[in-house]
């Protein structure tokens, strides 16, 4: 069953545009932190990855909660932050956001800003990253049922 879930998640993201925010976020995490977004952050704590509930377990998990909140605000404006394309560059460790297509601006630009804040947060908290909080198949029973309000 878990294998099927992973396969379906993979297929969904594989079929998403290669310029989507999802793929750009993966690249940004790798460039800024030196870590894989999937292998280091997906399933970390109570908020990293799909969904989220309970209280963040540490500073890294709070980065994910803040990222979820940022995306939630964009959805209220009618954006689709996981799908809105954007471009970014990194010069001397500084991420600069831009848009790829006029139709995805300003949503793509705003999604990039959410992602940028998240990866900077991850970088600031690398020293306190706790491998014990990372689960490949997150069920998150320790997180409770309620979602922390933004």
From Swiss-Prot:
Name of the protein described by the UniProt record: Group IIC secretory phospholipase A2
Cofactor binding mode and count: Binds 1 Ca(2+) ion per subunit.
PANTHER family in the record: INACTIVE GROUP IIC SECRETORY PHOSPHOLIPASE A2-RELATED, PHOSPHOLIPASE A2 FAMILY MEMBER
Subcellular localization(s) per the UniProt record: Secreted
Disulfide pattern: 46-143, 48-64, 63-121, 69-150, 70-114, 79-107, 97-112, 99-105
Segment forming the signal sequence: 1-20
Protein species of origin: Mus musculus
Known tissue expression: Testis specific.
């Amino acid at each position: 069953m878990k294998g099927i879930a992973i396969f379906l998640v993979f297929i969904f993201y594989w079929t998403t545009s290669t310029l989507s925010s999802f793929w750009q976020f993966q690249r940004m995490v790798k460039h800024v932190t030196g870590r894989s977004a999937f292998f280091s952050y997906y399933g970390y704590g109570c908020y990293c990855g799909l969904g989220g509930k309970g209280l963040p377990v540490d500073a890294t998990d709070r980065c994910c909660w803040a990222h979820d909140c940022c995306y939630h605000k964009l959805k209220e404006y009618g954006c689709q932050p996981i799908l809105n394309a954007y471009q970014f560059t990194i010069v001397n460790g500084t991420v600069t956001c831009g848009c790829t297509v006029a139709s995805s601006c300003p949503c793509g630009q705003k999604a990039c800003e959410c992602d940028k804040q998240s990866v900077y947060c991850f970088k600031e908290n690398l020293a306190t990253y706790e491998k014990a909080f990372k689960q490949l198949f997150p069920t998150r029973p320790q997180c409770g049922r309620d979602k922390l309000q933004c």
